[in-house]
Amino acid sequence: MSAVLNCNITFIGGGNMAQALIGGLIARGMPTTRITVADPFENVRQLLQEKDVHVTDDNIAAIEKADIVVLAVKPQVLANVLKQLHGLLDGKLVISIVAGADLATIGALLDTTRIVRVMPNTPALVQTGAHGLYAEANVSAE
């Protein structure tokens, strides 16, 4: 976990599960200056600004300095988001918490294979959840 706290993390989507994960990162010592959230909704961005994280409505600008990009959007908008980010994630680790989105689909639309699939559960909303993880063979344990 300590290595993650030294990374710049961008969340594409700032809904409930993203907010729970952000809260967990902050609670474990991640500086808020290392967290960026891109969300199209002004009310969500305002709520996240109260946590002192960077917010924007521009997905491309949000990922510019990211080491890790967390896909936290609704399944119905995922394809559009992935097309927008296609070819822009070289060297970045992609983590998807999108329900029903498999690694092959995400990798094909992004043109990358450094992807981890995470399935958080609702207790994560109160920092007590368990998460299932799956990664392709080329993703290191770091």
Q: Where are each of the predicted segments found?
A:
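Generic secondary-structure signature for well-ordered alpha-helical cores
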Residues: 27-30, 87, 111, 138
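Short beta-strand and adjoining strand-loop segment in the mid-core
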Residues: 36, 128-142
